[in-house]
């Protein structure tokens, strides 16, 4: 009877683990599809001007790639400096990873998730977030409320969205640094969406590669 209980316990644990993985997979696919639909809607709303937007975006990246690389490096250095400052604070204030990062890390633990996780985190995620937080909040609403003011709103809301489940208020700073740089690049480029998308994709690509390397060690 004891052996049966142990067997049932193992089977139940297996089923729970499988169900959780399936739920995470479904949620990841659903989120990816919703992002793809959002990008498609953006395209349909700007279908007449989209080719010109794409051309301008590509031309900007070609012409100002050095500026974009410099800003990307600055974002990395600023983030590392923030992490270093966090290490000087009392232990109770510190955090190793943000709650958002911990949640995303679950997707990396199953190889089956990696292709869809890459698409979600590195490609469609940054594009959708830049459409919402830069194009809509700054590019569109900025025409009515002032671009600088909406840039501040964009940086704050972007950071808050990513720390909604945070256990430490200091997690806000980790995302605010990236948000400020994305806003600056977007405004500096005369609101060229390709500029901030490029920085955002590079940032997420680096995080993706580091996570893969860390998990494989």
Predicted segments, located by residue:
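Short, small-residue-biased leader/transition segments that mark boundaries at the very start
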Residues: 2-6
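Juxtamembrane/transmembrane-helix boundary motifs at the membrane-water interface
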Residues: 7-30, 211-217
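Juxtamembrane helix-loop-helix connectors linking adjacent transmembrane helices
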Residues: 16-24, 51-125
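Functionally critical transmembrane alpha-helices in membrane proteins and complexes, commonly lining
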Residues: 24-48
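Alpha-helical transmembrane segments
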Residues: 36-40, 75-83, 180-183
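Structural signal for the C-terminal ends of transmembrane alpha-helices
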Residues: 42-52, 185-189
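Transmembrane helix-loop-helix hairpins at the membrane interface
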Residues: 80, 109-217
């Amino acid at each position: 009877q004891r052996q049966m209980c142990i067997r049932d316990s193992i089977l139940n644990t297996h089923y729970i683990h499988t169900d959780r993985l399936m739920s995470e997979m479904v949620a990841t696919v659903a989120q990816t599809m919703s992002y793809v639909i959002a990008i498609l809607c953006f395209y349909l709303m700007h279908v007449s001007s989209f080719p010109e937007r794409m051309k301008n975006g590509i031309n900007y990246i070609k012409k100002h790639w050095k500026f974009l690389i410099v800003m990307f490096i600055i974002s990395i250095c600023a983030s590392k400096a923030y992490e270093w400052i966090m290490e000087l604070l009392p232990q109770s204030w510190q955090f190793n990873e943000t709650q958002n990062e911990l949640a995303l890390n679950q997707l990396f633990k199953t190889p089956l998730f990696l292709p869809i996780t890459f698409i979600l985190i590195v490609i469609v995620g940054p594009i959708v977030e830049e459409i919402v937080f830069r194009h809509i909040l700054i590019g569109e609403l900025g025409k009515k409320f002032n671009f600088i003011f909406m840039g501040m709103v964009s940086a704050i809301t972007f950071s808050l969205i990513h720390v909604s489940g945070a256990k430490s208020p200091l997690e806000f700073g980790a995302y605010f640094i990236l948000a400020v740089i994305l806003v600056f690049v977007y405004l500096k480029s005369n609101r060229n969406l390709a500029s901030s998308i490029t920085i955002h994709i590079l940032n997420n690509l680096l995080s993706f590669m580091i996570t893969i390397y860390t998990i494989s060690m």
